[in-house]
Amino acid sequence: MMELQGKFLIAMPHLDDYFNRTVVFMCEHNEQGSMGLVINQPTDLSIAELYSKLNFMMKNDRTFGNEMVVAGGPVHTERGFILHKNTLNAFQHTYKVTKELSMTTSADVVETLGSTFAPEKYLVALGCSSWGAGQLEKEIRDNAWLVVSSNDQILFDMPYEDRYAAANQLLGIHPYNFALAQVGHS
């Protein structure tokens, strides 16, 4: 079984549906199936707006910057998933993804966002991407996805619109090359 947890999946150009030009960070991969978060499709909802919609007490010491909530995938689109650097804080529903990263689905992590108690780096997603047993492996064999080691700079710090090209460049691929490969094929 291939080891995909903690890796990026890069959508091949022929994926023309929800996953067109996406990068997915894989949070879980085992015999039962796979789950990940699209990291480069921002919604029009900022983290600050999400925070206020959830009716958390807005405190003066909260700063959110320009971070947006991303559309993590077409499954459970009403649920929040927070991918973050590991912390000393114990959140209620946290799953360790890698040595450095965890995913939390409980509101207690949201309560810390924008404060000094927040994880050092985090990505807030609504929805996730999931595959049944063997489904993702088949899609990879069918050349729907490229797999590459993840990179914290791409995951947390890079502008959303640059993440697809940057993930491809981890493999030495310029996305323009895909367009050339499609010429003459119908």
Swiss-Prot record:
One GO cellular component this record assigns the protein to is: cytosol
Coiled-coil portions: none
Q: Name one Pfam family in it.
A: DUF179
InterPro entries, sorted: AlgH-like
List the PANTHER family hit by this protein, alphabetically.
UNCHARACTERIZED PROTEIN YQGE, UPF0301 PROTEIN YQGE
**Of which family is this protein a member?**
Belongs to the UPF0301 (AlgH) family.
Name assigned to this protein: UPF0301 protein NTHI0415
Source organism per UniProt? Haemophilus influenzae (strain 86-028NP)
